[in-house]
Amino acid sequence: MKYFGTDGIRGIFGETLTDELAFKVGKALGEIVGEGRVIVGKDTRVSGDSLEAAISAGLTSMGVDVLLCGIIPTPAVALLTRITRSFGVVISASHNPPEYNGIKVLKGGYKIPDEMEAEIEERLENGSFPPRLVVGRTKSFREGRDMYIGAVLEIFRDLDLTGEMVSLDLANGATTTTAKEVFEFLGAKVEVFNDSQDGLLINQGCGATHPRFLAEEMKNGKVGFTFDGDGDRVIAVDEERNVVNGDRIIGILAVGLKEEGRLNSDTVVGTVMTNGGLEDFLKEKGIKLLRTKVGDKYVLEKMLESGANLGGERSGHIIILDRSTTGDGLITALELMRVLRRSGRNLSDFAKEIPDYPQITKNVRRTERMSLENENLRKIVEESTSRGYRVVIRPSGTEPVIRITVEGKDREEIEKIVEEISRVLES
């Protein structure tokens, strides 16, 4: 598709993502919605106000009422659309730098399917929108944040964090409006980093894509959680200041849920990027791993297809389907705390049980002449695979790059394979 990637529309504001495009997306979505309502939320980016106004103008011009939540995590908008059975729009570029922004469309708690994205694209390409006699209105819906916090607290009503020291890196993003309040309400003592709503600081050297920041800076926390800009990812830090990635979080949750009888079909969904160490660990515990394409929407599709209720990605996108319909960093963090409290164990003890095979990812800038249908490339992949290395080469769904990932047990050999593939792609 021309506009939609693996996580909605995304680009650098003022270049590939403009107010004009946002206005047209609003009109196209408005045609589909009819005379209903759309809940709109955003992260802290400076361009969020402008895009919010543009997409709202497009929606209201088509007779749709718009409920403005302000700064609020993506999973909060998902929950609100599920409760109200309505459409939602999130203005965010998730983990990307501040100059990026994006548009995600949700319906009834879920990101819309590819077919509906294609329908919006078709309307954008046609560019003709019949006038509506009825014009919609924009209304403040700041109580949406309180509804989300209330729902999360109800889910974890039996979780008592009294005496727990927790450190949070809020990435200067959307969880600045929710995470600290929830942890404190549950009794935890909270140390907070990067809680500014200055839109120029979001994800800058902090958050889920820079977990070492929290590992190096946390002072009092027995456990730490670092979120991304829109709050749908989380990475943990243990009491020894080791980073605990999404794969290991999934492994800990899988064992915890299985012990409670909550892990549907003893199955977990991951992606082609899921570390082989997690797969081996789960197999030892009698748990099956299903793999799918990269992207939390594809993880969710596979979960719904297989009946699994736990799935996610190494990046920290983790879906606990009996808790939430989408990846929710806050819910994942609280579920992990619940498993730890129930077991009486430290996070480091759990995490060390899960192997994490060396894995290197390199981004190569994508050019028009670059092709993955390359005989030399095929030979490298086949030869590497025959020696026990796992190779994944794929276009990014959110950035103009080709991602090369190689996994195995010999880091030096992995580095050689990655560089060899890079040379072939760039030649």
From Swiss-Prot:
BP GO annotations: carbohydrate metabolic process; peptidoglycan biosynthetic process; UDP-N-acetylglucosamine biosynthetic process
Cited PROSITE patterns: PGM_PMM
Protein origin, superkingdom: Bacteria
CC cofactor: Mg(2+)
Any GO molecular function: phosphoglucosamine mutase activity
Modified residues (Phosphoserine): S94
Keywords carried by this UniProt record: Isomerase, Magnesium, Metal-binding, Phosphoprotein
Pfam families on file: PGM_PMM_I, PGM_PMM_II, PGM_PMM_III, PGM_PMM_IV
Reaction equation(s) it catalyzes: alpha-D-glucosamine 1-phosphate = D-glucosamine 6-phosphate
Catalytic residues (UniProt): S94 (phosphoserine intermediate)
Binding positions for Mg(2+) per the UniProt entry: S94, D228, D230, D232
InterPro entries associated with the record: A-D-PHexomutase_a/b/a-I (IPR005844), A-D-PHexomutase_a/b/a-I/II/III (IPR016055), A-D-PHexomutase_a/b/a-II (IPR005845), A-D-PHexomutase_a/b/a-III (IPR005846), A-D-PHexomutase_C (IPR005843), A-D-PHexomutase_C_sf (IPR036900), A-D-PHexomutase_CS (IPR016066), Alpha-D-phosphohexomutase_SF (IPR005841)
Cofactor binding note of this UniProt entry: Binds 1 Mg(2+) ion per subunit.
EC number annotated for this UniProt entry: 5.4.2.10
GO annotations of cellular component type: cytosol
Alphabetized CDD domains for the sequence: GlmM (cd05802)
Post-translational modification: Activated by phosphorylation.
Known function: Catalyzes the conversion of glucosamine-6-phosphate to glucosamine-1-phosphate.
HAMAP family cross-referenced by the UniProt entry: GlmM_B
Family statement: Belongs to the phosphohexose mutase family.
Name by which UniProt lists this protein: Phosphoglucosamine mutase
Organism the protein comes from: Thermotoga sp. (strain RQ2)
